């Protein structure tokens, strides 16, 4: 979990911006989307191999 300590004379908007930036760097949003629904291991392997194939040909 990302923590942001609000500094003296810092606006709430800038602290919120720092928090969102920290969350984006940590990949929290992508992790939430990935774990939103259960994905069978076979489907996960299939997606991984398809992504590798796309990277290879592009």
Swiss-Prot record:
List the residue ranges of the region (Disordered): 32-58
The transmembrane segments are none
- Any Pfam family the entry gives: Ribosomal_S21
Q: Compositional bias (Basic residues) at which positions?
A: 43-58
Q: Where is the composition biased (Basic and acidic residues)?
A: 32-42
Q: Which UniProt keywords apply?
A: Ribonucleoprotein, Ribosomal protein
GO terms (BP aspect): translation
Query: Can you supply one Gene Ontology CC term for this chain's record?
Result: ribonucleoprotein complex
* InterPro entries noted in UniProt: Ribosomal_bS21, Ribosomal_bS21_CS, Ribosomal_bS21_sf
Tell me, what is one Gene Ontology molecular-function annotation carried by this entry?
structural constituent of ribosome
> Of which family is this protein a member?
Belongs to the bacterial ribosomal protein bS21 family.
Report the PANTHER family cross-referenced here: MITOCHONDRIAL 28S RIBOSOMAL PROTEIN S21 (PTHR21109), SMALL RIBOSOMAL SUBUNIT PROTEIN BS21 (PTHR21109:SF22)
Full protein name: Small ribosomal subunit protein bS21
Q: Which organism is it from?
A: Lachnospira eligens (strain ATCC 27750 / DSM 3376 / VPI C15-48 / C15-B4)
